[in-house]
Each structure stands twice: as C-alpha cells, then as structure tokens.
C-alpha cells in the first residue's frame, strides 16, 4: 500500500521542525514516496524551496499548514484587545485564549491562494502569534482539505479533556467531541478527515486514535493516517 505523508515540519517550523525542505524531499525519495506534504506551524515560508526540490526529484509537492486556531467553528469570531504581562496590547479571540492546531491542505490552485490568504490574515488580525479565525477559515475554504489535527487540536482536546491523558474517555467528552466533528463535517463536507497519528508509545495518541475509529463509524467521516514529523 502506498503511503503519502500529509503532515510534516521542516526547519521553517521554528523550534519544532528538523531538516530543511531539501532534506525532507531526499528522505521521501529514499522511502519511495511519490508525493508528500509540508505543513509548517503558522507559515508557508518553506513552500518555494520545497516545490523546487520536489519537482527536481520527481515528487508531487502538497502544500499545507498547521494552523494556530481560535474559535474556528464560529464564523463571527469576535476579537478583543488585552494587556499582557508586560503591559503590551494584544489582540486575542474573545472566547478563550488557547490556540488549537488544525492541519490544512491545498488541493488545487484556488486552495493554495486561499491557504495564503488565511496565513496572511492570521498575521494581520492577531498580535504576536498568527491565529486563524473562524471567519477567515470559513470564508476561504474553497479548494482546501481539512484534517482534524494532532493531539493539540480542538477535536482531540475536547475528547481528552485538554492536554493531559485520561485513563479512559468519558461519555460526556465523547458526546462533545462528536458535536465538534459533526460541525466540521457540516462546514467542510467530504473535505474534512479525522487525522490518526500512529505514535503507539504515547498513551494520549492511542486513546485518541481508538476514539477516532468510533467517531468515524458514528459519523461516516473518513480517517487519514499521518506522521507528524
């Protein structure tokens, strides 16, 4: 079975990525990949180098983003000015300040234009940290594929009660996660997928992946396997 990784970080994911775009492409060729995606944290700055290296190697480049998201399911996501600990003004989502992760992929030229619009808006609208709002994501959703994201995503944190690892998933948490998944499905249709990451040494990932199997059966949302590398 051919595998195409749809979640990857180069050194352009500052502080969280390893290897240049050229090195990632070289490794993909070693593994006999025919295509691969790059999904940097909050930016698309690696895409030019990635595309150049991929095309030279006969590899299909897939352009993506791991976005920092505010209330992405709220189209009218209000923002407010806050004073941070240093006394500087910050513009943050009014409904909570925690940013969840979301994997976004461009499936065509229109999608790539919209991906860059989303990134640009995330820097223009929010102070210090680029943040994708519900309005930006939903108004630029044409040509995009949305994966539910890593264990820091809205769906995963709803399911697992935050960043910790519960001994088991309680029914109220599953019902809340089901509602989140259905709302994403309602917004993005067949372009929304549950993202499974096979990090079997991490209890959190195992709990998340098992629950996603159940969510997939209950909702009809397809699953996709990625390696968050």
Where are these regions (language model features)?
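Phosphodiester-processing cores and adjacent nucleic acid-binding clamps
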Residues: 1-229
